[in-house]
């Protein structure tokens, strides 16, 4: 069933929120709790921050191109390498054990210019037979000058990753379009431009293609709906990052998140959408009740509902 959401609007930034909530938690929760409760909460958060989970989905499409049957897409998001405490080896093993056919990253790889030297250890060894693709997030832009951004993008290319900045790449052997939308949060997105190549490439019912859209944030969903996608992969929310038991996240930094769509798989306005909770952290180097994740999507021909496994 497809949920309907009204047009998007601006929201409170995660940085502003965490600066406020971090002080509140410290002064009014941890410090006023007994030492045992405070230590327990911090221990829980430490465990959640370092426990990398695998979320595996089987997705079914009646018109899936035959070449995509059984193919697996791996999604990484929001690594925030500056404060990331999960090792490169852990991420490498978690990804490569699944033997993905395609790997994508949906933004916020870095949180500081010093993170540029960490790209090779974390991303250099990852391989996929049909390629590796990346889009930018707000942190990628906010911490780099124009000159450093050029160097950053070149580093990805040197490591055999393909940056997609409002452009699409076609894999003819798979009949797959990968549409990379630049970061909406910093107003670098141009969905019309990202879909330009696809609009000039005719398709028919007898020759279907699969459109995989990538963006850091869901805040460009309205425009993606206009053009269509068989799967739209995003991140940015961190699943809330700090989520108290039984409660919705206090901040998600997106319009959809404020309406309850802050992580996981949904169909919204006809678009199958996945919001990745990410791997790293922002502002506060902890996660609570939102462990880091890597997502895998295996495509099948058929009309069955999605199936999910978690490890």
Question: Each PLM stretch: what is its role?
Answer:
Residues 1-23:
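N-terminal secretory signal peptides
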Residues 32-67, 86:
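C-terminal segment of N-terminal export signals and the immediately downstream linker at the start
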Residues 70-80, 175-184, 212-216, 272-277:
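Active-site-proximal beta-strand elements of phosphoester/diester hydrolases
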Residues 76-77, 103-107, 132-138, 164-165, ...:
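Active-site neighborhood of phospho(di)ester-bond hydrolases with catalytic His/Asp-centered motifs
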Residues 218-295, 303-304:
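Conserved beta-sheet core of the metallophosphoesterase superfamily
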């Amino acid at each position: 069933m497809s949920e309907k959401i009204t047009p998007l609007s601006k929201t409170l930034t995660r940085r502003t929120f965490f600066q406020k909530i971090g002080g509140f938690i410290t002064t009014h929760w941890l410090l006023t709790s007994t030492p045992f409760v405070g230590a327990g909460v911090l221990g829980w958060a430490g465990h959640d921050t370092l426990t990398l989970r695998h979320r595996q989905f089987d997705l079914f499409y009646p018109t899936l191109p035959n070449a995509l049957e059984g193919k697996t897409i791996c999604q990484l998001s929001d690594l925030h390498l500056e404060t990331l405490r999960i090792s490169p080896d852990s991420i490498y093993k978690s990804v490569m054990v699944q033997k993905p056919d395609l790997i994508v990253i949906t933004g916020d790889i870095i949180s500081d210019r010093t993170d540029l030297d960490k790209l090779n250890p974390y991303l250099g060894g990852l391989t996929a037979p049909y390629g590796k693709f990346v889009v930018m997030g707000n942190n990628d832009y906010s911490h780099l000058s124009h000159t450093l951004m050029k160097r950053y993008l070149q580093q990805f290319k040197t490591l055999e990753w393909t940056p997609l900045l409002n452009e699409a790449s076609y894999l003819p052997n798979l009949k797959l379009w990968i549409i990379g939308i630049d970061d909406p949060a910093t107003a670098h997105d141009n969905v019309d431009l990202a879909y330009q190549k696809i609009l000039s490439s005719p398709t028919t019912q007898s020759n279907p293609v699969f459109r995989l859209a990538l963006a850091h944030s869901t805040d460009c969903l309205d425009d993606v709906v206009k053009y269509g996608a068989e799967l739209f992969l995003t991140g940015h929310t961190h699943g809330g990052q700090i989520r108290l038991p039984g409660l919705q996240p206090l901040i998600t930094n997106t319009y959809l998140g404020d309406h309850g769509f802050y992580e996981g798989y949904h169909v919204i306005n006809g678009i199958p959408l996945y919001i990745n909770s990410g791997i790293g952290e922002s502002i506060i180097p902890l996660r609570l009740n939102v462990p880091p994740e890597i997502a895998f999507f295996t495509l099948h021909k058929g009309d069955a509902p999605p199936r999910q496994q978690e490890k």
